[in-house]
C-alpha cells in the first residue's frame, strides 16, 4: 500500500472509531466513515475487505486510546509515588476510567452495545490487557491489593448507576472506591459454634 493509501485508510479508521464512540456499532457504515473522512464511499473497498474489518479496526483504535489515557495517568501516579496517598490513588483511578475522548454516556452505550457484536467484543477483549495493566500500576502506587478487573468493575458499575440515576459519576465512583478500600482484604474463617449437648 502506498503512503497515500495508508493515510486514507487511517483516516477511515479514525472516522469509524469516532462514529463508534458517538453512535455505537450501528452508526459505523462504510459510507458514513467515508463521508466523515471526506473520501469517496467507493474508495473504502480498496482499503478494507468488508464492513467487519473496518469495524474491528475502529474498535481496536478505541481500546488503544482508552488504554493510552489510563497509561498516561498511571505514569503520573508513579512519578508522584512518594507524595501519593490513598486519596490521590482514588482520584487517579477515577481519572483513568472517566477521561474519554467521547462523552461518558456515549462511551458506556458503546460498551454495552458491543456485547451484541462479536467483532467489537473480540477487539475489546484483546486490548483489555493494557487497560488492566494501567489500573494495576496505579493500585501498586499505594500498595492496594485489589485485582484490576475488580476495580474496573466497581468503577464501570458506579458510572452506569450514576448515569442511569442522573447522579454525578465522579462522586458516585469515589464513594464506592472508598467503600471497597475500607473492606478487609482477608476475612478470617467463620468460627464454628461448639456442638450442643442434650
Segments predicted by a language model, with ranges:
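DNA major-groove recognition helices of helix-turn-helix
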Residues: 51, 61, 131
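Short, basic, alpha-helical segments at the C-terminal edge of helix-turn-helix-like DNA-binding modules
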Residues: 60-67
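Amphipathic alpha-helical packing segments from all-alpha helical-bundle domains
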Residues: 67-70, 98-109, 113-143, 149
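Helix-turn-helix
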Residues: 11, 19-57
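Solvent-exposed, amphipathic alpha-helical segments
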Residues: 11, 15-22, 68-72, 76, ...
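Hydrophobic alpha-helical connector segments
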Residues: 70-103, 148-151
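Hydrophobic/aromatic-rich alpha-helical bundle segments in the mid-to-C-terminal region
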Residues: 120-125, 138-198
